[in-house]
Swiss-Prot record:
Compartments where found: Cytoplasm; Nucleus
Transmembrane segments: none
Disulfide bonds: none
Protein name according to UniProt: Silencing boundary-establishment protein FUB1-like protein
Source organism per UniProt: Schizosaccharomyces pombe (strain 972 / ATCC 24843) (Fission yeast)
Amino acid sequence: MNNPTSDDRLRFQQKCHKSMLNTGAIFKNCKLRNGDVLQEVTESLTEDSEFNYIVNESQNVSTRLIFWNKWIYILCANTSSNITATRIFRLDDDQPWNLESLVAEVCPVDTDNRLAEHAARTAKDTSANELNYESYQEKSRAPFGFAGPFGAMPGSQPMFPSIGASDLYPAGIGGSDMGNDGGMIPTFNHPIFHPENRSRNEQASANRTNIPPGARYDPTGPGDFRGFGRDERKPQFPFKGPRSQFPGEPDNDDFMPPGSSDMFM
């Protein structure tokens, strides 16, 4: 039998259908080539019909026959787990088809167990993620275990210098206990509003022509004394006076970055 007729093709389809039922598969429906769906096998079957079954009460399995030369290919697919397999029979083989191995290949015994374990594992992970989130919240703490912001504690001397704390507040408002003579909102007590109190070097120094009064200045290299408020022509000891500053030391008007009082922000 090299070229099966239409009747032969329908006969082989019915043979395949009976073989599937012998494996314990439950017939679900049959889809014809034109898209019609049959709830039972009748004589109106056409070539290339797709038979759908239920295996192990939960797995959806589809079969389809392909005829080529002297062979019949049975294509089987588990649409629930995307497992496929194929069996080949000769057209002149009149023996019954045993498709138990085919069904077992596309529907392994542990398929349901794997699906159940996956569902249980997913549910477990979901429940673990839904635990009280607040129980895992770690309260924000200041550095080194201090309850207050980094710097001076109220009523005590700071263990670490509160660098830039005075820049966060206007003069006389807030700040540390060490005093506050400046801030990001200068008042009329700020030196920029009292040029008469500036030093002679600050007013006349040729090296400060491009530096506005009260601005921060970082030295550009050796011999640059503008950060000390003096120039090379009038050397003086840089640490003279209580308000002497190192080169590059932040001025009272320098802004502190947001969240500077809490390193965890």
